[in-house]
Design a protein with these regions (language model features):
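PLD/PLD-like phosphodiesterase catalytic module centered on the HKD motif
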Residues: 2-7, 14-217
Length: 217
């Protein structure tokens, strides 16, 4: 009996995350080759896994538009003609040491979004127990995608990886007299506002129980 039969929603490494992710990338490749809009969004601390690099390069060559937020190491070089010209890699290193991993495939209402504990590294995908799970709620899925828009709008800390391995500081392109937009500061302010609104309305948050045994929290 396969390991996947034990799970309804979870994708669990080392057996499931990489194959399922490659399947999702293949789905976007099929769309691109058919002349349909195809997109991949990824947020990871690093990308060093050869299989993922080769698969994303294949997707780029097929015409899939790929945008990646990679805070640290990237062994994938974007903007190489004929190979990775459809890949954009940016990095935001600011006040918050972010560790969230997001993997999204598709365009518009057909976008599928996964959150994960796994970076795009061989040690995470092939040698550790890691998990990935889909964001099925439409409102939450939209919120995650809006997060990407916010981060990519950063003009204070965003740096873009070039094909020669250097980074371009986008803050240098902010018009004189205009304050740079700091995405992390913006998200912090949003969190404070949401917390104040929750307190004012008496909103309570759900508590979790062990589904296997039931009971009360």
């Amino acid at each position: 009996e396969s390991a996947s039969s034990y799970y309804k929603e979870l994708r669990v490494a080392p057996l499931m995350i990489k194959p399922r992710m490659c399947e999702a990338i293949d789905g976007e490749i099929v769309k691109a080759k058919a002349g349909k809009p195809a997109r991949i969004l990824m947020k990871s601390n690093a990308i060093t896994d050869r299989d993922m690099i080769e698969k994303l390069t294949e997707a780029s060559r097929a015409g899939v538009k790929i945008t990646m937020l990679v805070r640290g190491i990237s062994c994938l070089v974007p903007g190489v003609p004929g190979k990775t010209e459809n890949i954009r890699i940016v990095s935001v290193v600011g006040r918050l040491l972010e560790h969230s991993r997001i993997y999204a495939f598709g365009v518009g209402d057909e976008t599928t979004v996964f959150l994960s504990s796994a970076d795009l590294m061989t040690r995470n995908l092939d040698k550790r127990v890691e998990i990935a799970w889909p964001v099925n709620d439409p409102a939450l899925r939209a919120r995650v995608l809006d997060y990407f828009t916010t981060m990519l709008s950063d003009t204070a800390k965003l740096r873009e990886l070039q094909s020669d391995g250097t980074f371009t500081d986008l803050c240098a392109f902010v018009p004189e007299g205009r304050n740079p937009f700091d995405a992390q500061d913006h998200l912090i302010k949003e969190a404070y506002i949401a917390a104040e609104r929750a307190r004012a309305t008496g909103l309570t948050y759900p508590q979790f129980v062990d589904a296997a045994v039931g009971g009360t929290p």
